[in-house]
């Protein structure tokens, strides 16, 4: 099954539970389900990109801080999909390129990636935290239409950026979440109509000190929305962030050796 993973960087469950009106509407109409999960520690971006995409916790991967700038030593969803002959793409922050394609990031070489031998074969990568989410979703849709990827990562940054500027309990942070929900309302109906499985989550949350990295619930509790016939949409599940990689690989139908939250998947997904 073709699958889209949306990582809304820095979106705390504290805000996702009330600000994402479109996503909750789709859930209310039986097209998806909303869960929450606790992110791995430390609640920092680069370690948790690695956790989500490889299923390996930061203390095991060695990516334990944002300043650990090296390629991943683990196999990611991108690797499994590419090796199975599937097509991969990402519209994402440049740390994704550094983890799985090449490091250090060289904008002239890497910002627009068209390299079928790399794990992320096709990509639009940005390095400015203020890069507009509206443009990022357009970048993603351009990749989808041009390359027809089996696995597409969409990774906007403006929620996290607003949190670092204004904090969790700010209108700016909440409104950035609402804006991301609006962009999803523009694009996601088309994805679902074309049979995509869609997972929307966050790497970590945000606190009122305009930071994250620790163990406060607002930093560690993040949303998980799932949409599509590949998901069971069962209530009461407690998926782990380390299980998302294997669950995505199972949706894609590729051979892998990662942990899976089986109850998230419908009977047709293995």
What positions do the PLM features span?
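Feature captures the catalytic ectodomains and active-site-proximal regions of enzymes
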Residues: 1-270
């Amino acid at each position: 099954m073709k699958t889209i993973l949306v990582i809304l960087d820095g979106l705390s469950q504290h805000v996702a539970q009330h600000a994402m009106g479109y996503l909750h509407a789709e859930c209310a109409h039986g097209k998806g389900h909303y869960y929450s999960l606790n992110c791995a520690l430390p609640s920092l971006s680069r370690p948790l990109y690695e956790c989500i995409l490889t299923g390996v916790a930061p203390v095991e991967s060695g990516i334990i801080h944002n300043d650990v700038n090296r390629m991943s030593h683990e196999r990611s969803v991108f690797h499994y999909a590419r090796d199975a002959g599937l097509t991969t793409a990402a519209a994402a922050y440049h740390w994704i390129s550094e983890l799985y394609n090449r490091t250090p990031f060289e904008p002239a070489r890497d910002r627009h990636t068209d390299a079928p031998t790399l794990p992320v074969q096709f990509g639009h990568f940005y390095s400015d935290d203020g890069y507009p989410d509206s443009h990022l979703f357009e970048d993603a849709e351009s990749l989808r239409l041009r390359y027809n990827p089996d696995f597409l990562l969409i990774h906007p940054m403006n929620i996290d950026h607003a949190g670092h500027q204004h904090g969790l309990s700010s209108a700016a942070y909440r409104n950035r979440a609402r804006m991301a929900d609006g962009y999803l309302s523009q694009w996601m109906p088309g994805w679902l109509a074309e049979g995509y499985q869609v997972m929307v989550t966050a790497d970590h949350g945000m606190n009122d000190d305009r930071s994250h990295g620790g163990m406060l619930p607002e930093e560690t509790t993040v949303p998980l929305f799932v949409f599509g016939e590949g998901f069971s949409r069962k209530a009461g599940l407690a998926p782990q962030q380390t299980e998302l990689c294997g669950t995505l690989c199972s949706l894609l139908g590729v051979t892998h050796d990662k942990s899976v939250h089986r109850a998230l998947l419908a009977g047709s997904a293995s």
